[in-house]
Amino acid sequence: STDKHRALNYLSVRYPAIYVKAAEELERNFLLTSVNAIFSRLSDNRKIVSVIQSFTNKETGAVEKYFVRVDLTEEFPFIVTKMAPYYDR
């Protein structure tokens, strides 16, 4: 969807923490294996997208996930929550 792509584009240009996290995880032997964008359950009257980065350990196969929420309601997107661990429900 266009909103999900807007969130990904915004983060790739305006949020260096996604690159910092990828570098930190690489030092721990984790590879970036996926990036997903999903509509947040927190969006009542706002368009909020959660962008989730998944990292997989090269030796053990263990997966760690981190996410950041982006509000896309207005013309200019902005961060709702900073990068934090993500847990599947």
Features from the language model and the residues they span:
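Exposed beta-sheet edge and beta->alpha loop/turn motif
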Residues: D44-R89
